[in-house]
């Protein structure tokens, strides 16, 4: 990783690494290490550690924000916001895809744009921060970058209702078809993206929906389809 890229990333995360090798490892994919016959360390173990820290900090946030929720409700919220889509969006906004070290084969197949790889780099950064600066440093970073997005997603009035599942049940009951969702547009800056999604049955567009994430936009499209096709309003 070039020094300027590392410096910019350290400024973004609000921490100067005492052990720069940790930051380097966090952005090193296994394919890169394999090509060098494992003479460098890759980020899988840091990803594992970062995932655990992320779950804890987001769990803490949800516990504070929704004090009357059940354990099941909190788990559902966490699963909806700690996922590949959200993490990859954050990683892209931070430019981690431009700093990742990939093997030649992985790079040629578009590895720097694969949500799974990009999301794993975010988790690895969290793990590196935890090891280099301790829990509070990692917690501060997550709160800064992740919690505001989680706040918007969980704060949406339609969060609790699973409209996609309901729509699929009704469509399959009547026609055996499965609704499909397509992204029509992405608007706004990376840190405040809004998605426009349509829901189709066969090739017919039933409805559209907007949301701060693809999943939220899909839920809104399903909700609108339920209202238009089945007259369901709640």
Curated annotation (Swiss-Prot):
It comes from the Bacteria. Its EC number is 3.1.26.3. Residues 162-231 form the DRBM domain. It is an enzyme of class 3 (hydrolase). Its main location: cytoplasm. Signal peptide: none annotated. The active site is at residues 51, 123. InterPro entries: dsRBD_dom, RNase_III, RNase_III_dom, RNase_III_sf. One of its GO terms (molecular function) is ribonuclease III activity. Residues 6-134 form the RNase III domain. CDD domains: DSRM_RNAse_III_family (cd10845), RIBOc (cd00593). It is found in: Cytoplasm. Mg(2+) binds at residues 47, 120, 123. Its cofactor is Mg(2+). It catalyses: Endonucleolytic cleavage to 5'-phosphomonoester. GO terms for biological process: mRNA processing; regulation of gene expression; rRNA processing; tRNA processing. Keywords: Cytoplasm, Endonuclease, Hydrolase, Magnesium, Metal-binding, mRNA processing, Nuclease, RNA-binding, rRNA processing, rRNA-binding, tRNA processing. GO terms for cellular component: cytoplasm. Belongs to the ribonuclease III family. Digests double-stranded RNA. Involved in the processing of primary rRNA transcript to yield the immediate precursors to the large and small rRNAs (23S and 16S). Processes some mRNAs, and tRNAs when they are encoded in the rRNA operon. Processes pre-crRNA and tracrRNA of type II CRISPR loci if present in the organism. Homodimer. This is Ribonuclease 3. It comes from Bdellovibrio bacteriovorus (strain ATCC 15356 / DSM 50701 / NCIMB 9529 / HD100).
């Amino acid at each position: 990783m070039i020094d300027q890229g590392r410096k910019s990333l350290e400024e973004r995360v609000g921490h100067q690494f005492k052990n720069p090798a940790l930051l380097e490892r966090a952005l090193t994919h296994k394919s890169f290490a394999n090509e060098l016959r494992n003479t460098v360390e890759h980020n899988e173990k840091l990803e594992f550690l970062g995932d655990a820290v992320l779950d804890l900090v987001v769990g803490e946030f949800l516990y504070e924000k929704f004090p009357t929720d059940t354990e099941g409700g909190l788990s559902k919220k966490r699963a909806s916001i700690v996922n590949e889509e959200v993490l990859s969006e954050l990683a892209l906004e931070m430019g981690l895809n431009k700093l990742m070290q990939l093997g030649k084969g992985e790079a040629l197949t578009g590895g720097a744009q694969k949500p799974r790889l990009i999301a794993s780099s975010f988790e690895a950064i969290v793990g590196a921060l935890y090891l280099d600066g301790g829990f509070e440093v990692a917690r501060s970073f997550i709160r800064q970058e992740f919690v505001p997005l989680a706040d918007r997603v969980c704060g949406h009035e339609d969060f609790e209702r699973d409209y996609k599942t309901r729509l699929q049940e009704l469509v399959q009951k009547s026609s055996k078809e499965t609704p499909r969702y397509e992204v029509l547009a992405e608007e706004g800056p990376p840190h405040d993206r809004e998605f426009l999604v349509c829901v189709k049955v066969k090739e017919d567009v039933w409805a559209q929906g907007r949301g701060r994430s693809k999943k939220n936009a899909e839920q809104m499209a399903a909700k609108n389809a339920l209202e238009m096709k089945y007259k369901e309003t709640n």
